[in-house]
A protein has these predicted regions:
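Active-site cleft segment of glycoside hydrolase catalytic domains centered on the general acid/base Glu
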Residues: 147-168
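N-terminal pre-domain/capping segments
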Residues: 2, 23-138, 173
Length: 183
């Protein structure tokens, strides 16, 4: 009787403990998706057409640290960090990371704010969205806009951001606005 009880207790303990070891191994082997905003390392790679550096070693170092995706922060004149969208995507993917998103934006001119007609700025966005699509971006985030001085300017900016969002959606890209404390 004691032998049967001992055997039963051992089997119960083993079956209770076994899954923990399997879960621990699976958890250890799982790779997490962690992205980095390249604005965080702008001093190393340059940004917005200034102080351009070879960003490939920085991308490699970030991938080696375990990052799996990036958010660009240097879209300028149809390029990312001085490279075509296709070149930029290739360079990021070459180190095993994914191009996920980008921070970029274009404020409205005084004339556009006064008239409420932002069709000229939307031409810029047409090129911008096409470049982001070519780079493989899933998201575009506008990180900053000037603080509107009047309620009318605020409404114009709301209409503007909604128009950008609509164009992005039509291109299969998600769009957002990254607010700050001053807004």
């Amino acid at each position: 009787m004691k032998r049967k009880l001992f055997t039963a207790v051992c089997i119960l303990l083993a079956s209770a403990i076994a899954p923990y070891g399997a879960f621990a191994k699976a958890k250890k082997d799982a790779k997490k998706d962690i992205g980095i905003q390249l604005y965080s390392v702008r001093d190393l790679i340059g940004s917005f057409g200034r102080n351009q550096h070879d960003y490939k070693p920085v991308l490699k170092a970030l991938a080696d640290m375990g990052y799996t995706s990036i958010e660009a922060a240097s879209y300028n004149d149809g390029k990312f960090y001085g490279n075509t969208p296709e070149e930029f995507r290739r360079d990021v993917e070459a180190v095993g990371m994914k191009v996920l998103s980008s921070h970029c934006g274009k404020g409205l001119s005084d004339e556009e704010l006064a008239s409420g007609d932002f069709s000229e700025s939307m031409k810029w966005w047409d090129q911008c969205i096409a470049a982001h699509k070519a780079a493989g971006m899933e998201y575009i985030v506008t990180p900053y806009l000037p603080v509107p001085k009047t309620l009318k300017e605020m409404q114009t900016y709301c209409d503007y951001l909604n128009a950008i969002g609509k164009k992005c959606r039509e291109a299969g890209i998600k769009y957002g606005y990254h607010n700050h404390a001053h807004e």
